[in-house]
Amino acid sequence: MDTPSSSADVVNDHHYRLVYFSNELPSDEQIGAHLRRLQALSKDRRHPILKVFLDDATEVLREELRKLPSHLLSLIAPFESIIDFAYQFGLRTGPFGGSTEGVSTCLIQLGTYISYHECPTNEPLTSPHGTLVALGSGLLAAAAVSFASRLPDLVKLGSEAIRIAFRMGLRVDQASQRLETRRAEGPAESWAYVFSELSEDEVQKELATMNASLNFPAPSQIFVSAVSPGSVTISGPPSRLKTLVRSSELLRYAKWASLPIFNGLCHTSHAYTHADAEDIVSAMDLPTNSSYIPHAPLLSTRNGQPFAAHTPAQLFEDVIFELLTGTIRWDTVTATLHDRVALHFVPEVVVKALGAPNALKGFNEAVQAHADPVRVITEDVLAQSLATPLPVRAPRDPKDSKIAIVGMSCRLPGGAVSNQSFWDLLEKGLDVHRRIPADRFDVDTHWDPTGQNPNASKTPFGCFIDDPALFDAGFFNMSPREAEQTDPMHRLALVTAHEALEQAGFVPNRTPSTNIERVGVFYGQASDDYREVNAGQEIGTYYIPGGNRAFAPGRINYFYKFGGPSFSCDTACSSSLATVQIACTTLWSGDADMVIAGGVNVLTNSDGFAGLCNGHFLTQTGNCKTWDAGADGYCRADGIGSVVMKRLEDAIADNDNILATVLSAATNQSAKAVSITHPHAGAQASLYKRVMDRAGVDPLDVSYVELHGTGTQAGDATEMESVTQVFAPMGPRRRTEPLHIGAVKSNIGHGEAAAGIAALIKVLLMYKKRSIPPHTGIKTELSPVLKKFLDKKRNIHIAFEQTPWKPVYNDTRYAVVNNFSAAGGNTTMLLEEAPVKEIQDDGDDREKHVVAVSAKSKVSLKGNLEALLAYLEENPETSLSDLAYTTLARRMHYNHRIAFSASSIDHVKKQLRYHIDSEEQVRPVPSNPPAVAFAFTGQGAFYPGMGAQLYNSVPSFRDHITHLDSLCQQHGFPSILPVIENIGAETQEEPAPIVTQLTITCLEIALTKYWASLGITPSVVVGASLGEYPALHAAGVLSASDTIFLVGQRAQQLEKHCQLRSHGMMAVRASVEQITECLGDQPYEVACINAPQDTVIDGLQADIASAREKLQAQGYKCHQLDVPYAFHSSQMDPALDSYEQIASSVTFHAPQVPVISPLLSDVVFDAKSIHAQYMRRATREPVNFVGALQAAQEIGIIDHNTVWVEAGPHPVLVSFIRNCLPEVKRLVPTLRRNENNWNTLADSLAGLHSDGLTLQWNEVHRPFEASLRLLDLPSYSWNEKRYWIQYRGTWTLTKGKEVSQPVPSSAVSTLTTSSIHQVLQEDVTGSTATFVARSNLMHPDLFEAANGHRMNDCGVATSSIHGDIAFTIADHLYKKITNTSAPGINITNLIVLQGLVAQKFSKADQLFELRATADLTTSPATTTIHWYNVTDGITSPEHFASAVVEYGDANVWLSQWRRLSHLVNSRIASLERMATEGKAAVLPRNMAYRLFNNLVDYADKYRGIQSAIMHEYEAMANVTLTTQGSGTWTVPPYFTDPVAHLAGLVMNGSDASNTIDYFYVTPGWAGLRFAKPLVKGGKYQSYVQMTPIEGQAGFWNGDVYVLQDGEIIGLVEKITFRRFPRSLLPTFFSPPDVAKPLHAAAPAVPVKPAAPAPVPVSAPAEAFKSAAPKTAAPVPAPAPVPAKRAEPAPAAAQAAATQNPTITGALDLIAKESALELSQLTDDAAFATLGVDSLMSLVLAEKFTSQLGIEVKSSIFMECETVGELKTYIEETFC
């Protein structure tokens, strides 16, 4: 072999050279060391051939992986190179075990061989006087070396050896798995045992005896695979190997060991033929002629002679055939080597071993025992390589490669909301600048053309996206709150990324290049307007993740679960194109296989305008006037753009539409410019040259340059100078073809960070349209500075009208895109148009296809349907197969989905119209797909040609059938292929029973494999009669080989022992009972109970004929089955014994999925139920299909949601299942007699997809992909709503200025009481009024009242204080409106959300605000009041208490109450009687308030109860009100509380309550009213009976009646109490100026100053309903800045949500914090979809604790995935 040192100089004729390639794979540690070494050497420029070999081998491996079905491909982790693949040690235990070992062996041996020869100091390993010897997989590497006369030859030969190693491993695994499936658990089992001290004859004789005695089927028989001096190796399926050794007296006691051969069977002609070898090497990419010359002979391990092949392909085929079928006879190899050494008369043999040379021990001994001893020098090259230190690396230059752009999308000014609308704008030459819109800021207040107003803009112009607030939050799983706080740049990056991915036909993990772990996201962004100005006005939860730049790409990664790199880049104006370059570099470096890149810019901050104006960047006269004589600066613009990119070879392999390719891209810096913002022509020209040189493209071949072209005199002139210098020079070599230039900024302004991506998308559209749009920047005349650059000699042109874009060189258009940065950076990209795509026009002959449309909402679903219909109306020539391929294999699918089968585009349009009209009927599919049951048909469904279309058009299906047919023949059975292929159907006789039964079995096994490739695998299986055999295979009970063996043997035994056609079978449409009643004692047997009214009977033909006559006479339908025997009848008896004996040789495994047994009428899970006797019984006994399904249904294995797939040639079982399980929603066939297979499948696949099953649609279309084209269909129809935080005021102008403090205004009303201190607003209009006041809890009177009601040693405003406030405001407003005294006042629906807790130490004001609205036009007239906290002078947007006052007639109330007085008085009398009898507790005053101290410490003024009687939850009290005067009150709390707080005494003092562990507090009442005023010193009686609220655990309510002299004069209606753990008391009631204590059950939650202590959310409205007239619904109080509130849920939803108050509170909180509608919180709504992310979870967990009193972890929203699961959790845990 020629090496850096010529072999002629180094070969020693006194040596005989032997190179040995071992079959032993090194240890994992050594493999890692070898791989690391090869990786390091490949990066060294001194090992170029190694690098090329590794690259070629990687590509070869990728080519093979692309051929794999998805279920196999998913097992392989993404990899950058073949070295990464070899590191995947875990693959060795699965279907890729043999492949990975073979690939690793070849890789290490060949890589080491190449690197060894690339070192100039090493002697060549081979020579003309040498021989190659190898064992096992080492033969593949040796074969490559054999024909590599030059080292570069080994690149191609070696990479093909890698391919063959991979393919052979897969073939061996497939063949071996048909013989015996691998164990699901436990260590791998050996397929080979080696015996020493036994001769080959002894072993062969013993094997023949044992194979026969154990009745092993031919394919599974044990055989001799290798013979060497002193040892014999036998091979076979592991279970049979063990059985044979245990059963053999000779072998059991011999000396033997199992070999580490775990990946299947080789060296046997039982399992393989020459066709297997031919198929394995068929994929090789080697010339058929002899372009390679044999360099060194390779010895066969079968006979020791050199392989006689004359071409590498022939040699590889011979090697593969030997590995698969040949017995290793190493003694012949040793003999040949001995003879060759002797012939050369050399004294020395040099053995270079690539791997452990243990196998050469016999050769060494033979040559040394010769009469003239020969010295043998052995060197392990692999071991020596590891021992040699790595040289200092000489780095290799980066590798250039074409990058394909396969998708794009944009949102650009001028209404460019799509790629097409952007092109329309360009084509028309529009200039879309306009005045700054109001949604950004008020241009009139923020614009000053004179520049006198600080911080104001000097220009009112810009180019803007139409309504950037629009966004589909639900699609991207964002809550409305998160969407509102998220920068619209980030939101539109998500939107355009999705649209670009759609155009690219992206489906996660569809191909190796779309593996989500290998997808990266890159976006350029140079400003933070929305975060700084809009969201910064009111900083919320999502201020950081919604506005920080890193979250723009990060959010895309997170949403799509992309595991690749994520970068946000800021290079000022060049951010987006520089980002695209970084993304390309990532692809070139192999760090990702697909990237999404783009740029974003949305302008909302006036500061940017002001700063750029002051920096002299901006024009004040309109848009960018690029190249115009009057160019005076640029015009700012919005812009969002995204592109999807892959390496070109991946895009071609993925059948993508390629928009253009990137040949080269680079960035440099204008470091030598006069200032940082000034351009530099030399730097720009240098960059262009570098880009062109890297790509190897002549600059004169470029026909279009998209310039940066901002419209500044200096910038445009400098760029034009650099462009003409390189692309249109004036030197001796000039352009012969025109160069056009353009600049998109003249249309849509300067998008800054998005400028580059806008320019790139423009050029991509030019490629698509093959046209150059007109330039619109020159408004007056060409700038005089630029005229010299546009000399005719340069042949450079500006298009002023639409111009065809013609190719310049080799029919290829090259374009350059420039994007420069104000910070000095220059980025340039070279583009080439996409390669021509070749489509096979006649490759897809399917008649019927599935078309699907889906969305995440009904609105979007309808929009998608309408858009697709419009597309088809505009494009009637659309190919149906392309449409099906695009909508299924190249689309992501969502939960609102429609799928249907169609045979024409007209049919599709008809279906679309139907579904548009009925889209409301579509229900979203469940998040968890339904279980799938497979039913396997029996013999009665047979017909010739079944499965023929699948067999002819799906290679994987054909392979399965072919291999199964091979197994049939290996077992000695006839071939099934003539039946499948339907060869000679017209002349052929009816197939023999064995053929029909084998065909059905093999077909159903192959169909199961095919369904698995489509992503559909059974969770349970059932088979009818013959169908039970493929069912057992599908469940993993039987291997494919054993299944075929049993079916064939059963057929042979029946043929041997039973008379053909002597018996018959008949299906009867009747139950077993009805048949019995009809036939009486007439002879027949029940064979199958298929359905309640479907039974099969059998017997002698005459008996069946007689039975038929009787049954039909009774009106029963009968059908004679066309079967050769009466299965499941006594006719089977003669064959049963022999069949059972045969079946006993088969290995039965535990089911991997449950097996529904029609024999047992039960479900089988274990390994002991199915055995040889079971197979005997299943042959003879009835098939009870009904009983089996009932048993499965009873234990929950199947239910009405289970989807049934009938895996058979014709739907027979579908009707049986429907009759047994009428509620089943979906049953689909696979094939149907007299119908094209694809038509049947189309209908079934459409149904399965509609049910929510995840289908591998790419596998459906894979056989036809070469003839299919990805359509550019309309993008997703968004369900958009506006999410926008409007910038308010002019604070960006005034920031930094000293703000004068406002002077407190005088009160606007004279109203002042102890509870209301300052009226801020009082407006009366007709019969309505609004009122705003503030009160100070530290006011002496109010503080005394609150401090007299102490809880947890804190003063807490009692509900009676809120009552006085309501009485006061209601009375005052009524008088103001009517100038008359107020009538009766009823305070209804008092709801206190948080307790008002007084400060403990601080003497500062503790303010709260009161807002009221009175409306006397309603009936009844009302005043609505809300209470708000005030912190640092700012009123909270959320109220903490509310009430509705209703005005009524006190006399009417008294009249109503008189009817109740006798009932209340009778209950009081009853309590008094019980007290006298000792049955009720009598509580004197001190005792009563001592019990109150369990929770509340009342001041003396409140202690009005003089005595009380209590029995469980019923009580009465005698009350005397205080005579102490204190303050100005309307209804003093010292009066209201004593007559009402008897209810609190019952709840917190009764023996019936657990007051040790719990306390009870009231969040409010339904009504409080007094028909007569309470008076100082007055004597009253109170009565109450508290009862639990039905359906609301932990809640009680009751009516407190207030009596005076036996007359009811007041009522507290439905005062409600709720139970809480006592441990939460410190959490709920702590002063705002004291940190809350830590507590085991209630972790501390920080409290805002002046905020009231949290009290649980009030009981729902249901708890407050009473017999009183209904109150008006609460009306929100006015607020200066109204907070966004959730709309109330519909009535039905409201009722469902209010069943439990805790759950109601939780849902209210979730809705409020997420800005969702309550109606959206349905039980099946997923929190991830609603946008409840980790941040929102933290907020909600805190709110749950502080406001609901329930402590949950923030992870609860991941553990409970849906609203329904959370409600269940709360109910079970806290209620």
From Swiss-Prot:
Gene3D superfamilies: 3.30.70.3290, 3.40.47.10, ACP-like, Malonyl-Coenzyme A Acyl Carrier Protein, domain 2, Polyketide synthase dehydratase
Biased composition (Low complexity): 1688-1697
Annotated segments matching region C-terminal hotdog fold: 1480-1626
Every Carrier domain range: 1697-1774
Ranges of residues in domain Malonyl-CoA:ACP transacylase (MAT): 934-1244
EC number(s) from the headed UniProt entry: 2.3.1.-
Record carries keyword Transferase: yes
SMART domains referenced in this protein's UniProt entry, alphabetically: PKS_AT, PKS_KS, PKS_PP
Domain Ketosynthase family 3 (KS3) residue range list: 400-833
The PKS/mFAS DH domain, residue ranges: 1317-1626
Gene Ontology biological process terms in this record: fatty acid biosynthetic process; secondary metabolite biosynthetic process
Domain (Starter acyltransferase (SAT)) ranges: 35-262
Pathway it works in: Secondary metabolite biosynthesis
Residue ranges, annotated region (N-terminal hotdog fold): 1317-1451
O-(pantetheine 4'-phosphoryl)serine found at: 1734
GO MF annotations in UniProt: fatty acid synthase activity; phosphopantetheine binding
Chain residue ranges for the region called Disordered: 1671-1697
Region ranges (Product template (PT) domain): 1313-1631
Swiss-Prot/TrEMBL keywords: Multifunctional enzyme, Phosphopantetheine, Phosphoprotein, Transferase
InterPro entries, alphabetized: Ac_transferase_dom_sf, ACP-like_sf, Acyl_transferase_dom, Acyl_Trfase/lysoPLipase, Ketoacyl_synth_C, Ketoacyl_synth_N, Malonyl_transacylase_ACP-bd, PKS_Beta-ketoAc_synthase_dom
Catalytic activity: holo-[ACP] + 8 malonyl-CoA + 8 H(+) = atrochrysone carboxyl-[ACP] + 8 CO2 + 8 CoA + 2 H2O
Catalytic residues as annotated in Swiss-Prot or TrEMBL: 573 (for beta-ketoacyl synthase activity), 708 (for beta-ketoacyl synthase activity), 750 (for beta-ketoacyl synthase activity), 1349 (proton acceptor), 1537 (proton donor)
Role noted for this protein: Non-reducing polyketide synthase; part of the gene cluster that mediates the biosynthesis of physcion, a natural anthraquinone fungicide that can prevent plant fungal infections. The pathway begins with the polyketide synthase AcPKS that condenses 8 malonyl-CoA units to synthesize atrochrysone thioester which is released from the synthase by the atrochrysone carboxyl ACP thioesterase AcTE that breaks the thioester bond and leads to free atrochrysone carboxylic acid. Spontaneous decarboxylation of atrochrysone carboxylic acid leads to the formation of atrochrysone.
Domain comment (free text): Multidomain protein; including a starter unit:ACP transacylase (SAT) that selects the starter unit; a ketosynthase (KS) that catalyzes repeated decarboxylative condensation to elongate the polyketide backbone; a malonyl-CoA:ACP transacylase (MAT) that selects and transfers the extender unit malonyl-CoA; a product template (PT) domain that controls the immediate cyclization regioselectivity of the reactive polyketide backbone; and an acyl-carrier protein (ACP) that serves as the tether of the growing and completed polyketide via its phosphopantetheinyl arm.
Protein name: Atrochrysone carboxylic acid synthase
Organism whose genome encodes this protein: Aspergillus chevalieri
Lineage of origin: Eukaryota, Fungi, Dikarya, Ascomycota, Pezizomycotina
